[in-house]
């Protein structure tokens, strides 16, 4: 089992370097095979050296492939963890948002409870008599509850109704002041009639400017009468 040592270069750089080395060794190998045998040099020795170098490069490439596989697997796990962390972050953000909404709602409930507690303590310090409450409730019931049917109980005609009746209107202030309750009343201006102030128009006389150094020229006078009799006779 080959033991892979940690490399100083990243996997892509190591792979490119290994493939370049193998390409050079293969080119050298093909050159040796294609060249004619030289009696001065040992071709077999050179072939053995190139073969050994190719074998070492192949083993190194195998280790690089395994290392790249481990690297890709680790990167895949890293991406999964990253997505998992992103999902957890979204959940945490949602929980924090709901906690903030709950905190605001709880603060509102606490404030409302404090106000209710103050009202309760105030009512305990200053209690309202029962007679006052009953009188207030009875006065409100006339306007908030429906009238009792005559089939269930006799109707008290002297009971105050929440709406004005015809008799109460006839006994009101308008009837006492002898106001007319039928037909159209007198029409006119309410209150004393006030005359509108007259606007006085100030007329300014036209000021004629005379020039003393200007001479009178009779030929410079134009006839401005457009409807003269002379034009009709022509």
UniProtKB/Swiss-Prot annotation:
Compartments where located: Nucleus
- Domain of life (superkingdom): Eukaryota
- Stretch list, region Disordered: 188-234
Q: What's the chief localization of this chain? A: nucleus
Entry GO MF terms: transcription coregulator activity
Where is composition skewed (Basic and acidic residues) in this entry? 189-217
The record's section on Pfam families has: Med4
Alphabetic keyword roster: Activator, Coiled coil, Nucleus, Transcription, Transcription regulation
Record GO biological process: regulation of transcription by RNA polymerase II
Q: Which GO terms describe its cellular component?
A: core mediator complex; mediator complex
Residue ranges annotated as coiled coil are 71-124
Functional note? Component of the Mediator complex, a coactivator involved in the regulated transcription of nearly all RNA polymerase II-dependent genes. Mediator functions as a bridge to convey information from gene-specific regulatory proteins to the basal RNA polymerase II transcription machinery. Mediator is recruited to promoters by direct interactions with regulatory proteins and serves as a scaffold for the assembly of a functional preinitiation complex with RNA polymerase II and the general transcription factors.
Assembly and binders: Component of the Mediator complex.
Q: Which PANTHER family match?
A: MEDIATOR OF RNA POLYMERASE II TRANSCRIPTION SUBUNIT 4 (PTHR13208:SF2)
Q: Which family does it belong to?
A: Belongs to the Mediator complex subunit 4 family.
The molecule here is called: Mediator of RNA polymerase II transcription subunit 4
- Organism this protein belongs to: Cryptococcus neoformans var. neoformans serotype D (strain JEC21 / ATCC MYA-565) (Filobasidiella neoformans)
């Amino acid at each position: 089992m080959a033991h892979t040592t940690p490399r100083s270069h990243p996997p892509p750089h190591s792979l490119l370097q290994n493939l370049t080395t193998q390409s050079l060794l293969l080119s050298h190998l093909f050159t040796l095979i294609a060249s004619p045998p030289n009696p001065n040099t040992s071709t077999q020795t050179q072939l053995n050296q190139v073969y050994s170098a190719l074998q070492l490069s192949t083993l190194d490439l195998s280790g690089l492939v395994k290392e790249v596989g481990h690297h890709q697997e680790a990167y895949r796990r890293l991406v999964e963890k990253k997505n998992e962390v992103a999902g957890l972050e979204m959940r945490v953000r949602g929980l924090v948002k709901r906690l903030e909404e709950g905190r605001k709602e709880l603060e509102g409930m606490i404030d409302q409870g404090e106000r209710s507690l103050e009202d309760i303590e105030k009512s305990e310090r200053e209690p309202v008599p029962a007679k006052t409450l009953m009188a207030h409730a009875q006065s409100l019931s006339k306007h908030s509850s429906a009238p009792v049917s005559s089939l269930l109980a006799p109707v008290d005609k002297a009971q105050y109704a929440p709406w004005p009746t015809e008799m109460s209107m006839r006994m009101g202030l308008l009837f006492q002041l002898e106001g007319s309750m039928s037909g159209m009343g007198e029409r006119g201006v309410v209150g004393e009639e006030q005359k509108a102030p007259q606007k006085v128009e100030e007329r300014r006389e036209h000021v004629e400017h005379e020039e003393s150094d200007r001479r009178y020229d009779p030929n410079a006078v134009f006839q401005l009468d457009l409807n003269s009799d002379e034009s009709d006779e022509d």
